[in-house]
UniProtKB/Swiss-Prot annotation:
Residues 1066-1285 are annotated as: 3-dehydroquinase. It comes from the Eukaryota. Keywords: Amino-acid biosynthesis, Aromatic amino acid biosynthesis, ATP-binding, Cytoplasm, Kinase, Lyase, Metal-binding, Multifunctional enzyme, NADP, Nucleotide-binding, Oxidoreductase, Transferase, Zinc. Residues 868-1065 are annotated as: Shikimate kinase. This is Pentafunctional AROM polypeptide. It is found in: Cytoplasm. Residues 396-845 are annotated as: EPSP synthase.
Amino acid sequence: MKEIIKLSILGKDSIHIGLHLWPHITNELFTCIFSPTYVIITDSNIETLYIPSFKTYFISMAKQRSINSRLLFFTIPPGEKSKSRKTKALIEDWLLSEKCTRDTVIIAIGGGVIGDLVGYVSATFMRGVRFIQIPTTLLAMVDSSIGGKNSINTSYGKNAIGTIWQPERIFIDFTFLETLTEKEFINGIAELIKTIIIWDESEFASLENISEKIAKTVRSMSLTSNKHSKFNEIIKDLKRYIISSIKIKAHIVSIDEKEKDLRTLLNFGHSIGHAIETVLAPYILHGESISIGMVKEAELSRHLGILNPNVVSRLIKCLNTWGLPTSFKDRRFKEVILGKKHLIEDILEIMSIDKKNDSNNKKIVLLSAIGKTYEKKASSVSDDDIRTILSQNILLYGIPLNAFQKHTTITLPGSKSISNRALILASLSNGICYLKNFLHSDDTYYMLSALEKLNAAEFKWEQDGDVLVVKGKSGYLENPQMELYLGNSGTTARFLTSICTLVQPNSRENHLILTGSNRMKQRPIGPLVDALKNNGCCIEYLELENCLPLLIKPKEIGLYGGNINLSATVSSQYVSSILMCSPYAKTQVTLSLIGGKPISQPYIDMTISMMSSFGIKVTRSHSKENTYYIPKGCYTCPSEYIIEGDATSATYPLAIAAITGGSCTISNVGSASLQGDSKFSEYILKPMGCEVVQSPTTTYIKGPPKGKLKSLGSINMESMTDTFLTAAVLASVAYEESKPYVTKITGISNQRIKECNRINAMVCELKKFGIEAGELPDGIYVKALNTSNLPYSVEGINCYNDHRIAMSFSVLACISSKPTTILDKACVNKTWPYWWDILNSTFKVQMKGIEFDLNPTINSSILHHPSECTIFLIGMRGAGKTTLGQLAANFLGREFIDLDSIIEEDIKTTILEFIQKYSWDVFRRKELHFLKTLLTEKKENYIISCGGGIIETEEARDLLISYIEANGIVIHIHRNIQDIIKYLNTDKTRAPYQDNIMHVWERRKRWYNLCSSHQFHMTSTDPTEFKKNIPLNLKSSFNNFLRTITGKNNIFSLILKKKRSYFLSLAFSDLENIFSLLDIITAGCDAIEIRIDLFQKPEEIDKYPSLEYIAEKIFLLRQKTSLPLIYTLRTTNHGGSFLSSEKKLAKEYILHGAKWGFEFLDIELDIASELFKTINNSWPYTKIIASYHNIEKPISCDDFEWIQKYKEAQHYGHIIKLVGTSSSIEDNFFLEEFKSKFINKKVPSIIINTGIKGQLSRIMNTFMTPVTHPSLPSKIAPGQLSIKEINTALHIMGLLPEKKYFLFGKPIKHSQSPNIHNLGFEILGLPYKYQLFETDSISELKEILHLEEFGGASVTIPLKTNISILLDEISDHAALIGSVNTITRTYNNGQYILKGENTDWQGIIKAIKNFNKFEKSFENFSGFIIGAGGASRAAIYALLSLGISPIYLINRSKDKLNKLYHFFNTNHIIPITEYHELNNINFDIRIGISTIPTDNPIDPSVLEIAKIFFNLKRKSSEGIFLDMAYGSNTTDLTIIAKACNWKIIHGLEILLEQGSEQFLLWTETYIPYNQVKYAILGPNK
């Protein structure tokens, strides 16, 4: 038997540790823990892995010893969902059925779920039986198996119910670790780190130094078949730290078993971590949650002034080494976290029921140092402090008046630039170097982590993290066998690109990959790569040209050396990268900087100076400009290298002193600094009126009185470009009445390609304070405001993930009159992670954390496109940009600009002639210039059409991408490329392409996609004809598209108001198959669902259709219907056809759905968690339906999984959709119980069971129920019903009672209204009846209005103007018209309300707009109305609403006309009774309306006047005449109008339109319009 280590807990040697323990365990059972019945409880995963071996040993030893004990087994499903009341009851019932008694011994074999559950069963079964823990996961070994805690989960929280019941034995068998996956292994490491960091400083230091080695081996175990030998490499080290962790926990539990004080320390990271785990379950593992929790609780300690900031950084570094998430932005974590709404408040709510809490005080373990806590128990912490740490954004309240003008002293964190250079130089050296004041930040972490993975050096921390000890390996680097992720660290990316050329080739995988964040993948690195490739290095771009990710193939030769030419006008880091690498080249390097004056020369000088400190002297040529000679050699490091403070960071506290009139000393940056930015005080602050005193190592400044900063005028900041943001903020309040107060900062063009486009960002964010600023070709101008007039920012400051922007605007926030919200506060982690703590503790700035959802203003300004932001159109020549751009300008009421046209205005010739005279390159530069101008000067209320080749220029692409990132809209107008080619081949007016058109398209299409936020797909039309006459259905679809993407579409809010709503599910491989049925099958529907996963191109049945094919079908459908569309990509895991394994492709397809302007996206939960924030930011008006389908079980309160899925969907969706299955009618009752318990009425939900027996759930669902139609060939899901079937069922169930509707008036016997409404009721299956009630007396209506079954009524002559006395209220429209034509009856607050409405005017407007569909405005037109009865009131109101003026009223009765004129009391109405009153009519008469009933003869004088109007010359070619008579289509007036070429709209058409509005008021749905229209008007209408 192997060596067994026994540890004591609570005075007993209960913990046994070793390898291959089955024989030992069996022996212990039979000798020390004997029982007649042993019960093994495990899960189905563990059962097959370990139970056979244990059973073999147990039976063998029992036989040898003649023991007859029973061995029983109970297996449960794996996972957190089994840790429930239900499972506990199942186990207990089974134990009783097996006649188990109090002498039974229960053995838990498994992870934490098994241990917790079985421990609780053991504690309560027979009032407590003995049990044994055999943990099979690292997490369970170091945490849950030790100490006796046990529990189950409830719907109210994790581990909500449980006891403390100590196991008889805990057997820790390291053999189990060998079978764990990498993720399972690392999940347990978090708990191990937690235990060690609170108790043992030396053990933590040892662990962090060896973590990379162990983690690397663990990762490699999954890549090799020889897993056992790999495991043996690390088992010795692992045993040490596992045993240390167990010892610590056992010691603490022995002192405080019941968790009164000391044991609460073991909850470090758990107060916040458990809450995170509960909110995000099941997608986040326990260890991952605890990892985040530890970091947040350590940050809380730092924020409260208890903990050295370096400790936080060391903890983060250690956790990250293992691949554990350390922030809500962590790449390994944000797939789940992004998009969670109310995340922080949810976490705080869960924390409020933490078992450690004392009354309402939240208790958290606070670290005071590594190995030491602030108290020997958890400490009370306020919600505000927790919220500040957890929140993504921070609200700054400014510096209190009593803190102004106080002196502060700041010791800066180490310089990022020097830290990263020192790290490289020390790693490449041949000795040991102590780096002091090393910066702990995101940027240096990425560098340090990458160098560790390259095995470039050995690293360890000393002096509580203040000193980093580096043992270099003389330039030897290994291939890490994994990609190196560098975040958004441009410094790291550029330096490592050269360093990685020194990596030794590896026989297994001879390449390595450098990658980074999305922004990093847009930042240029081309000049550096070009120089290295020209020197023989093998480097490839994996995505965009000139950007990360890079694939680097190491060579034996490494860097060749010799003459290297490098363009350094973009970044000095290119130069530093090659300089530092050059001593290890094969031949001596001569580095020549070409292409113009290098940018940021002081940083090149800094690198050279530091290389000298490490033993390599670089010589600058005296004869050749910008040329350097670098000798071969190996760096020799100094024993100690002190890193000075970060000079750029120094500008922020100094600027606070300057802007407030205070004083500040920086203790570790002075005149001797290597950093160019150290000159900021002398060159910027001093001229602005500050007193400046510098020693070699310190800087002191005192600001002038508040509001007295002097303007700089014009200043070139090329030598200190990163500090321009601080200067710009100060310039914004440098207001002097007697002097110019505009500051121009130049020489900073490189700031456009930093973490973001900083110049553009500064302009945008200053505007939020009311400060005018604008871009210059290589800089920015800022117009100052007097500080006393400085408005506060009502919107949050968008930091663009840029630390410099966050810190700069925090300076301005110090003097703001109201709180300022800084969004994405964690971006400062790049250089100064504890900047907010400095503001709070040193400058006394009050602050609190804030979420988007807590501040609607921030929500709208940041997450949504500005409502009037300028829209840019891009796309191939001939795609229709200009035509659609003009249309868009008309729809949205904006000005249209054609970029090509303004260029031609400037060059005074055509583009064709200009290109022939100069070149395409010259034209592209001109085009770029105007694009920059438009982006700067035309930010709102424009539609701008760009030339097809605008995206050929890299800088133009960057500008468009930046505009999109700033929530601008760029639409790619696309037409089938073959249609474009056909058209362009006949167009000789434009400059010819230099390449084949198809080749041009193939080159550009990726750029169009990258540079656009949206795409509108033009269906096949002849471009020439298209220009002349745009099809109405195309106009309509484009209008709906624009309304959706600009947020002017209120569809979602309208659906929410309905008592019942439905969407039609379409299951077709080709949508064109149902176009002819569309009007019929969508009757009563509020939306249409398109199942993209079912699309299939006939000739490509074995693969997914292309996005272009899908777009073509979708946009064809758009032209056939105005209903909103639901874009659904259902995967095989959820019952669909799209392979669940194709997750990356699925995301691409879904994001294109958003790009195409879909109103709704149905996204499955696991994908929704990853895409929510992207969609919410980039396409804020598209609503997400977060869906989960499980067709194997019903929805029930007893199933923890459904509760979790509901909570997840609530976070990720604007709409929740859960679909289970029914095997019995009772399952639907369980579903209703689930809804009653868990439904959050603020988030609408679709919760149904599928299958025939689930139909009841569909009937009972009220919001957006998926439906089918009998005209469709098949149902998309079993049990799906039509709207008619649902309404019929609701009626039978008594939930939809009969109603009667009436037409009141006289004469009405020939009315078509009963036919219209009854046909609508019949089609939709509504149990309603519409009938005539002929009367001219309102007294006869009193009784009928109060019938129980009365639903509503139509009102016609002669009752329209006097029926209101019988009603409870009338609408504003009806009151303004003075006429009621519709009565509704609603139930409100226990009583029925009769309300009068008027839909006549709506019917008139709809009829006019349907005919003249896209006339944006009628304001330049006039019209006439014949008649003066009740209907004429609605006609007048309709024309006034359209903006038509003047309106001529024609009638023989002057009294009636005067009555109407005085009722409306407006000069827009001109009464006409006689012929002579028609003199001098100079208006454009476009619309005429007759309100005279069919059976009333027209007075001859009125007819003569009408003839004059019909014959008046109109500016437009068409006039529209509406004859509201419902009888014959031919009247005297229509005959005259037709003869004068007026278009006629007959009375029945208007009746149908206003009846449709009545139907909507009564039923909440539009009438099946085309079916009713066909039946009433006939097929020709």
